[in-house]
Curated annotation (Swiss-Prot):
Reaction(s) catalysed (UniProt annotation): 2 Fe(II)-[cytochrome] + nitrate + 2 H(+) = 2 Fe(III)-[cytochrome] + nitrite + H2O
Annotated binding of Mo-bis(molybdopterin guanine dinucleotide), by residue: 85, 152, 177, 181, 214-221, 245-249, 264-266, 375, 379, 485, 511-512, 534, 561, 721-730, 805, 822
Binding, substrate: 797
Principal location: periplasm
Protein name stated in the entry: Periplasmic nitrate reductase
Keyword Iron attributed: yes
Post-translational modification: Predicted to be exported by the Tat system. The position of the signal peptide cleavage has not been experimentally proven.
Cofactor annotation comment: Binds 1 [4Fe-4S] cluster.
């Protein structure tokens, strides 16, 4: 087969990308089809399975197997590029230990909590699962059942799960693993703008004059977006890049303003910037007067620890951490005035000239600024605050909702936005930014879902961290985990996670494609379909919703999470899960199953199977007899249409490479809240932050407060955890790709060479990382891509053989309830 010049150049670029990760690209590994069988390949579009960037790929299938993938040149997000993980997508589904049958712990032919895993049929698996869930519901009621889901759920999987729990079981104890990554971003948006998700889009990369990275290593975690920043920086010499972190990483290679700061002091630096803007008369007074109001948040809000923890007992406002009161601009100016260069430099360890350079980027009215952040902001005991505070500096200067002026929260999972946030799979949320605590929102959800009034419970359910605590305490007893690996991902796993899974009173179900740490801790493992083994939809960080068709069948008896949810719902009649007075309000539901009420309700089942594309298989449509995905999507979309969350009709997404909502009259929206761009902004207003009743954004006065745990004589190091380029999250997919595994096979303890020398350690020496909660064994690394300052160590968490979350602290932001994985105190002990 001839290779065109374009393909040759593209493959050279692939090889260069791979070489950065130290990956040899042999004939097999190159993922580039060059044989004569190429004409037998069927290529189709799909979004990448990994991060929240939402890159488009084209997928080649032959003989019911994915054999190649490549970047989709028609996708606006990545324009044909992929990162090194994306180039190996074709291999993630074919690990040697792929789960293909349900596995139940058994002894002497029966379920036993202490038994060994044995293969069973789906009927046997659901029989035991049904027995356990009904037992718990009968004995303790709906507050004792729960689910932990995912920002990797497809849109309809998350929607079906939310309906099953919030409407079917009448339990709000459903939360996604996006609680660990995006909850603070959600609260930041909701508190400031009254609506979730960014007002800008990826087009801002080509329009900005300055980029400020707050706690984000985009070079490794969002490499395709990083190429757009790099292109802008190198092609427009006046462009500036500031990178702020607690340790040096690859993104610093492009930094004009590199800043290493003491953990937690980003709060103080943001107040310094606000103060600098005010003191130097750089406030955009017209914008501020027309479009903002000021509030002061309560302080001393605690750290989301157990109620008997001394820090929680001392927290005066732990019960209402999100409260605030109105203030004036003058009050705000006085509040931030103490955050001058001298104070903040001493607190943060950042030289005053660096602080000034940073502040000048925001203050200069002629510089368009894009602020970008991920886990450094969000995984923070004041994560909601720090999100609010970055909006403060954009609002004070009016640098918002216009091309190149964009405070932009980057997303870590492929559908943390599209599913966890937009669908509302959090324990307190409903679709389209509605919440269970609002009676009007509950009423609207009950109307759309055809439920009797009072079905949806007002009280929010257990969030992610609280779920583990309630499992341990025996208050949450029937528990289903889908598309996540929380026994590796949760903080303080030995004290707060594992005990709950092994609690004899609890029955734990894990749906996964591989035998993860979490799956092996469960009582029942259900084999799940992956990625293009099912029809799906994701929503990325720029509000872009993307669809794909099922391209291959799942192996063996593996089934999609959607099928599992819907099939399991057939096991429950409404009388078994709803009180008699609720059933009496809808007597026609008596004797019906939850499947009938939730999924065969005249809406979800309204689209016949003949509407499924004849070019593709659809396992769920075949199983249930109607176009399941279309019915679920259209019912879900009805929540947001006409309310600023408009989605296009289902079929259009299969034709497009994604659309950014709100989609009104067939047109997507690039910049929200701006007249002329957002159809919801009234003419003559200029800007309208219509998520809030007054149409104004909130500027919050919030202080610096210390972290719950800092280094001391016994535990002298800060610990930060995170990711690396080659692996994604817990590594359950990427570590099964041989090339990615070889590139970075095991986690290490990155530390400063002088710290290692002072302790008599050298590179490669085996050590233990020890905290007040646990210990983990690894090896020292004093070279390479990550360079911590003295007094801090960085450990990636992708390695199932090195569970760094044995060590971390399960403290959270009390407002968002998101865990802080970036700072706790540890010591390093030579083995």
């Amino acid at each position: 087969m001839k290779v065109s010049r374009r393909d040759f150049i593209k493959q050279t670029a692939i090889a260069a990308t791979a070489s950065v990760a130290g990956i040899p690209l042999g004939t097999e590994a190159a993922n580039f089809v060059t044989d004569s069988e190429v004409t037998k390949l069927k290529w189709s579009k799909a979004p990448c399975r990994f991060c929240g960037t939402g890159c488009g790929v084209t997928v080649a299938v032959r003989d019911n197997k994915v054999v190649a993938t490549q970047g989709d040149p028609q996708c606006e997000v990545n324009k044909g590029l992929n990162c090194v993980k994306g180039y190996f997508l074709s291999k993630i589904m074919y690990g040697q230990d792929r789960l293909t049958k349900p596995l139940l712990r058994m002894k002497n032919g029966k379920y036993d909590k202490n038994g060994e895993f044995a293969p069973v049929t789906w009927d046997q698996a659901f029989d035991e699962m049904e027995r356990q869930f009904k037992r718990v519901l009968k004995e303790k009621g709906p507050t004792a059942v729960g689910m932990f889901g995912s920002g990797q759920w497809t849109v309809w999987e998350g929607y079906a799960a939310s309906k099953l729990y919030k409407a079917g079981f009448r339990s709000n104890n459903i939360d996604p693993n996006a609680r660990h990554c995006m909850a603070s971003a959600v609260q930041g948006f909701m508190r400031t703008f009254g609506m979730d998700e960014p007002m800008g889009c990826y087009d801002d990369f080509e329009a900005a004059d300055a980029f400020v990275l707050w706690g984000s290593n985009m070079a490794e975690m969002h490499p395709i977006l990083w190429t757009r920043i790099t292109d802008r920086r190198l092609s427009h010499p006046k462009t500036r890049v500031a990178v702020l972190s607690t340790f040096t990483h690859r993104s610093f290679d492009l930094a004009d303003i590199p800043i290493i700061f003491t953990p937690q002091t980003d709060l103080a630096m943001l107040n310094y910037i606000a103060n600098y803007i005010i003191q130097n008369n750089k406030v955009n007074k017209d914008f501020v007067n027309k479009h903002t109001v000021f509030k002061e948040g309560v302080t001393e809000i605690g750290y989301g620890l157990r109620p008997d923890h001394p820090l929680q007992k001392a927290a005066k406002n732990a019960a209402n951490p999100g409260d605030s009161k109105p203030i004036t601009f003058d009050d705000f100016a006085k509040f931030v005035s103490k955050y001058d260069a001298d104070y903040v430099s001493k607190l943060s360890g950042v030289p005053k000239d660096k602080l000034r350079q940073l502040a000048e980027l925001y203050a200069d009215p002629n510089v368009k600024v894009m602020s970008l952040w991920t886990m450094g902001f969000n995984q923070h005991t004041r994560g909601s605050w720090v999100n609010n505070m970055v909006y403060n500096v954009h609002l004070l200067t009016g640098k918002i909702a216009t091309p190149g002026n964009s405070p932009f929260s980057l997303t870590g999972q492929p559908s943390a936005c599209g599913t966890a946030r937009e669908v509302g799979t959090f324990s307190h949320r409903l679709p389209a930014d509605m919440v269970v605590t609002n009676p009007k929102h509950r009423e609207e959800a009950e109307r759309i879902w055809k439920l009797p009034p009072g079905t949806i419970v007002e009280k929010p359910g257990y969030h992610a961290v609280l779920q583990n605590r309630m499992l341990r305490d025996g208050k949450l007893n029937a528990y289903w985990v889908q598309v996540n690996n929380n026994m590796q991902a949760a903080a303080n796993i030995m004290e707060e996670a594992l005990p709950g899974y092994r609690n004899p009173a609890n029955f734990i179900v894990v749906s996964d494609a591989y035998p993860t740490v979490t799956a092996l801790s469960a009582d029942l493992i259900l084999p799940s379909a992956m990625w293009v083994e099912k029809e799906g939809a994701y929503g990325n960080a720029e509000r872009r919703t993307q669809f794909w068709h099922q391209l291959v069948d799942a192996p063996g008896d593996a089934r999609s999470d959607l099928w599992q949810l819907m099939e399991f719902s057939k096991r429950f009649k409404v009388e078994e899960v709803w009180p008699a007075e609720l059933v009496a309000k809808k007597p026609e539901y008596k004797g019906k199953t939850l499947f009938d009420v939730l999924y065969r309700n005249g809406q979800v089942d309204k689209f016949p199977i003949k509407e499924v594309s004849t070019e593709y298989h659809n396992a769920e449509a075949q199983a249930f007899g109607f176009y399941v995905q279309k019915g679920l999507f259209e019912e879900y979309a009805s929540f947001g249409r006409g309310h600023g969350h408009d989605l296009a009709p289902f079929d259009r997404y299969h034709e497009e490479r994604g659309l950014r909502w709100p989609v009104v009259n067939g047109k997507e929206t690039r910049w929200r809240y701006r007249e002329g761009s957002d159809p919801y902004v009234k003419a003559g207003t200029g800007f309208q932050f219509y998520g809030n009743p007054d149409g104004k954004a909130v500027i919050f006065a919030l202080p610096y407060e210390p972290p719950p745990e800092s280094p001391d004589k016994e535990y002298p190091f800060w610990l930060a955890t995170g990711r690396v380029l080659e692996h994604w999250h817990s590594g359950s997919m990427t570590r099964r790709v041989p090339e990615l595994y070889r590139a970075f096979p095991n986690a290490v303890v990155f530390m400063h060479p002088e710290d290692a020398k002072a302790m008599g350690l050298r590179r490669g020496v085996e050590v233990e990382v020890v905290s007040r909660r646990g210990r983990m064994r690894s090896r020292v690394e004093t070279r390479g891509r990550d360079a911590p300052p003295r007094g801090l160590v960085f450990v990636p968490w992708f390695d199932a053989s090195q569970l760094i979350n044995k060590v971390t602290l399960d403290a959270t932001c009390p407002i968002s309830l998101q865990t802080d994985y970036k700072k706790c105190a540890v010591k390093i002990v030579k083995v």
